[in-house]
Amino acid sequence: MNRKRKNNKHGFTLVELIVVLTIIAVLASLLIPSLTEYINKAKKQALIEEATDIWKASQTAMSECYALYPESFDDSCKFTTTINGKKISNLGRITNGALGALQTNPNDPVEANTSSRKIAQQVLIYLDSAKPSSARYLFNTTSNWATWGKTADEFLGKNPKPKAVLLQIFHTKDGKVVAINFGKNGYMVTLIPGQETTCVRNGKSLPSSS
């Protein structure tokens, strides 16, 4: 006679399920904030590295332009900004205005012989962004061309296009970059040579006036 084997396997009881779910909830409450913080730090570090590459490209373009056309810097260096509470005058300023215009039309005649346009054109080349169709960055995605004193969301919007960025470069009459703002994906990087680079969620770009 065949005996029925006793099946000792059984599912979780309601109490056991509640205990398991409680443990999962506790672990999630501990791990999710840490994971979110890690992701945010990784994003910020990646943007800082991008901004550093942009600073290198900008300084290279600046040095080349100054070596060839030093006289072109005189008229272009008419702007002011404030860094760490200190007002700095007689600076050149390159923004999305020039970058976007040249990205759209490389033969744009506005301020054609100024240092800002010469530098902007070279910066676009170094950043692989001279042609909109294959550009790494897009500078003409908004009609709001004034980059100074703006948060990332104010300038780019809360849902910016993937390649849309804010770029603001300040430089001296002798071709030295003194500050850069780089806005992307809701963050604002401020890079000032000799100081710690910052990356702030919806941070604000440096102010400026002429």
What are these regions (language model features)?
Residues 34-55, 65:
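Aliphatic-rich helix starts adjacent to a transmembrane/signal segment
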Residues 144-210:
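Short, surface-exposed interaction loops/tails
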Residues 18-34:
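Alpha-helical hydrophobic helix detector
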